[in-house]
């Protein structure tokens, strides 16, 4: 098994409800280490650029507005098969379809306010991590 890094974002719905610690505990209990973390407020430009792959989708504007509606916690998670493991811990994008015990099933308010973002591939993880963190900010 390969040790990987992936990006996680604790979204505004979760930070507003002070769930960051509970979410972090889920990652750590599953064997992922948080090797970088910061609480920030995204600008509209940052959110638009980060989610540019969805620019043509009908939900893009609402997604950007939601992501700038409050603070987020951006994180780098490290561990065995971190990308797939994080996606398993998060659960399905739509919390109604998420398995019991996943972050989205337990904490999400809706498909939009679904508490967390996670990279969907190693390639995207590398791009997303570099978007928020310099190499010196990641402490393994």
From Swiss-Prot:
GO terms classed as biological process: CTP biosynthetic process; GTP biosynthetic process; UTP biosynthetic process
First-tier enzyme category under EC: transferase
Compartments it resides in: Cytoplasm
Domain of life: Bacteria
GO molecular function annotations of the record: ATP binding; metal ion binding; nucleoside diphosphate kinase activity
InterPro entries the UniProt entry points to: NDK-like_dom, NDK-like_dom_sf, Nucleoside_diP_kinase, Nucleoside_diP_kinase_AS
Record EC number: 2.7.4.6
Keyword Cell wall biogenesis/degradation: no
Catalysed transformations (reactions): a 2'-deoxyribonucleoside 5'-diphosphate + ATP = a 2'-deoxyribonucleoside 5'-triphosphate + ADP; a ribonucleoside 5'-diphosphate + ATP = a ribonucleoside 5'-triphosphate + ADP
UniProt xrefs under CDD domains: NDPk_I
Cofactor(s) essential for the protein: Mg(2+)
Residues binding ATP: 11, 59, 87, 93, 104, 114
Pfam families assigned: NDK (PF00334)
Active-site feature positions: 117
Main location: cytoplasm
Keywords: ATP-binding, Cytoplasm, Kinase, Magnesium, Metal-binding, Nucleotide metabolism, Nucleotide-binding, Phosphoprotein, Transferase
GO cellular component: cytoplasm
PANTHER family documented for this protein: NUCLEOSIDE DIPHOSPHATE KINASE
Oligomeric and partner information: Homotetramer.
Listed name of the protein: Nucleoside diphosphate kinase
This protein's encoding gene: ndk
């Amino acid at each position: 098994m390969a040790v990987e890094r992936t990006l996680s974002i604790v979204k505004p719905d979760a930070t507003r409800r002070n769930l960051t610690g509970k979410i972090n505990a889920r990652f750590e209990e599953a064997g992922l280490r948080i090797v970088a973390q910061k609480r920030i407020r995204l600008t509209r430009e940052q959110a638009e650029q980060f989610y540019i792959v969805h620019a043509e989708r009908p939900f893009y504007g609402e997604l950007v507005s939601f992501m700038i509606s409050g603070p987020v916690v951006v994180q780098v998670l490290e561990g065995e098969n971190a990308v797939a493991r994080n996606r398993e811990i998060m659960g399905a994008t739509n919390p109604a379809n998420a398995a019991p015990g996943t972050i989205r099933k337990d904490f999400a308010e809706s498909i939009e306010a679904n508490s967390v973002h996670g990279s969907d591939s190693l390639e995207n993880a590398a791009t997303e991590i570099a978007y928020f963190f310099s190499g010196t900010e990641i402490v393994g």
